[in-house]
Each structure stands twice: as C-alpha cells, then as structure tokens.
C-alpha cells in the first residue's frame, strides 16, 4: 500500500462517517494509551532515564519542529489514529503539566519508553513499569471523577479506546542481551511469562472500567535496523530467528486475547497486527514510496536510539525522513507511521461501536 493509497483510505473512513452524520468523537470520548517507546508522547521527559527523546533531531518534523519526547521525527501512529478519530488535541502525557483539568476529558497517555510486559526490565531502565501505568490509570480516574462527576467519568472510561503497545523492548533490549535470562527461560518460556503479564494487565484495566482494548502485536523484530546490527551477524536481510520468535509470541498473544474475550462478555479486545504491514514495508519499500528500509534516518541508522547515539551531533542524519521506513534504529518514521495507522484503523472498527 503506497502513501497516497494510505492517505486516501484514512480520508474515506472519515468521509463515510460524515455522510452518516456520525461523530467519531462521540463514539470514542477518550483514548488511554499504555506501553513503550512506540507510543510514549513524553512521560520519560520527567524521569531520570537514558531513554528520552526530548531533544533534536527527534521531533524535527513535528508541529513547530518540537522534540516532545516522541521517538520519531514527527507523528506516532497513535497520533495519526487520534486525528482520524476526530480528536483535535492529543491526550496528554500523564506526567506532564498538561495532564490536568479539562485536558483529561479526552484521555491520557501513560506509556513509557523502555517499558514492557517485564516490569523488572522497566525498573532497571528507570521507565514506568506496566503495573505503575495501571496505578496511574486508577489515579487518573479519581481525577476525572472530580472534574466530570462519577457517572460521566465511568462513561468516558467505558467508551474510551485503551491502546497497549508492549513486547519489543522485552525481547530486543532485554531477553536477547541478558545472558542471565537465558538460564531461567527459553525464548518460548519467556514469551509465556510475558503473556501472563499481558493477561494480568487486561484484567486490571478492566477492573478500572476499560471495555474497549486494542493491543499491538510484536513487529518483525528481526527487521529493526538495530536488531540487524546486533544479532544479524552474516545473515543478509532480516534476522530470521527473531522474526520467528515474534510470530510465535503473536500466536500466544492472539490466543490469550481470545481467552479473555470469552471470560469477559462485555469486553471488546482487538490484537492489531503490526507485524504484517511493517514487514511488507521492509521487504518492498519502493512499493510504498520509500527508498531505505535497512537503516534509520538518524546518524548511521544502524544502532542509534536514545541520546547515546541519536542526538544533534549524530553524523550522517538524513535530510528527508519521508524516504526512510525507520527514523532511528528501532522506531518507524512518521511516513511509515501513516501506513501503520491505516492498519490500526482498519483492524479496529469493532472497538468503535
């Protein structure tokens, strides 16, 4: 799917609802976001962690060329999704000063770069572990009740879409680089451990009142530029064993989601397949108007992420990120996020009713 087709599909979705005189904003009163760097909009700016993106060249193509803490040159897939759903403002990062008063009526973002399903890894990285993100969600609900009243707050949370992006950091930044974990878990057993934590998370946010939940699958982790550099050795193309691990994890994730769906009759849960559209972009970049899919735009594009390597002094940063599938060695560019957002919207219609 090229970028023109992607934009046309997004426009068609909005136009169809306009014809039907249905407002996405009415159907989706708020968006709550949990997880990792793929969806963090600035919470890590307020933490003593290396995993931050509140400095150039991050954000150079965002509004006012501002580095907000998003791990991207511009908009995240969730930003584009929010716009498509009729939001004129993005739900604020929960730790930011903007997360107060009426701004909370449209939701909040609790995500934290370097977080994931493995809370111990998140704590080591000085990120917000998933259990703490749930605690912030509970705190958010208390604030919302004070602003809108108990009945309205319950309605907002029940009607909100809750998005979760997690798992990539657990494998790429934790399991694959931590010999101690090898002694405790096989990759399959570690995946099962993460799935147990996923199920716990769903039950916890359900208890707070969430009823519409979308969780992203693992991407083709073996195709991330950093993974090629660190784990590819002499293998050409994507690292096949990492992609196989991701596919096996995704099968477990879908099975767990189906089980939870049966367990809670009023729960709507969708597993967004991010693997397929991103894999297609990497394998056939020119089909979608890209010229580079093996490395990121920032610096050499092979290992750069966070301030350690992707910063204003990074040598070799590209001038036009729209030609790159990846912005840094881990995260997609805004141009790629536009295509991923189309996949999110297309797969998530059941959450809008």
From Swiss-Prot:
Glycans are attached at residues 197, 320. It is found in: Secreted. CDD domains: SGNH_plant_lipase_like. PANTHER family: GDSL ESTERASE/LIPASE EXL3, GDSL ESTERASE_LIPASE APG. Its EC number is 3.1.1.-. One of its GO terms (biological process) is lipid catabolic process. The gene is APG. Disulfide bonds: none annotated. It is an enzyme of class 3 (hydrolase). The active site is at 37 (nucleophile), 328, 331. Keywords: Glycoprotein, Hydrolase, Lipid degradation, Lipid metabolism, Secreted, Signal. It comes from Arabidopsis thaliana (Mouse-ear cress). The keyword Secreted applies. The lineage of its organism: Eukaryota, Viridiplantae, Streptophyta, Embryophyta, Tracheophyta. Residues 1-25 form the signal peptide. It holds the Pfam family Lipase_GDSL. This is GDSL esterase/lipase APG.
């Amino acid at each position: 799917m090229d970028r023109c087709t992607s934009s046309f599909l997004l426009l068609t979705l909005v136009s169809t609802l306009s014809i039907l005189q249905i407002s996405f904003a009415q159907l989706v009163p708020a968006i709550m976001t949990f997880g990792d760097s793929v969806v963090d909009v600035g919470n890590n700016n307020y933490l003593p962690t290396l995993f931050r993106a509140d400095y150039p060249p991050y954000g150079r193509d965002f509004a006012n060329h501002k580095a907000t803490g998003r791990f991207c040159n511009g908009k995240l897939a969730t930003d584009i999704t929010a716009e498509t759903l009729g939001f004129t403002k993005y739900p604020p990062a929960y730790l930011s000063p903007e997360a107060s008063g009426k701004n909370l009526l449209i939701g909040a973002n609790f995500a934290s770069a370097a977080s994931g399903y493995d809370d111990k890894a998140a704590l080591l990285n000085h990120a917000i572990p998933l259990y703490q993100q749930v605690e912030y969600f509970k705190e958010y609900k208390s604030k919302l009740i004070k602003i809108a009243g108990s009945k309205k707050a319950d309605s907002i949370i029940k009607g909100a879409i809750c998005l979760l992006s997690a798992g990539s950091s657990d494998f790429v930044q934790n399991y694959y680089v931590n010999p101690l974990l090898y002694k405790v878990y096989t990759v399959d057993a570690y995946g099962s451990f993460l799935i147990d934590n996923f199920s716990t998370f769903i039950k916890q946010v359900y208890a707070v009142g969430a009823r519409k939940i979308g969780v992203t699958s693992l991407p083709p982790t073996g195709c991330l530029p950093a993974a090629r550099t660190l784990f590819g050795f002499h293998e050409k193309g994507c690292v096949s064993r990492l992609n196989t691990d991701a596919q096996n994890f995704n099968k477990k994730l879908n099975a767990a989601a189906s089980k939870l769906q049966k367990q809670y009759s009023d729960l709507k849960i969708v597993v967004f397949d991010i693997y397929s559209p991103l894999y297609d972009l990497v394998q056939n970049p020119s089909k979608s108007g890209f010229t580079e899919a093996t490395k990121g735009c920032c610096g050499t594009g092979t290992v750069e992420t966070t301030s350690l390597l992707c910063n204003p002094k990074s040598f070799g940063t590209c001038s036009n990120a729209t030609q790159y599938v990846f912005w840094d060695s881990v995260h997609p560019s805004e141009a790629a996020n536009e295509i991923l957002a189309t996949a999110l919207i297309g797969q998530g219609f059941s959450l809008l009713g």
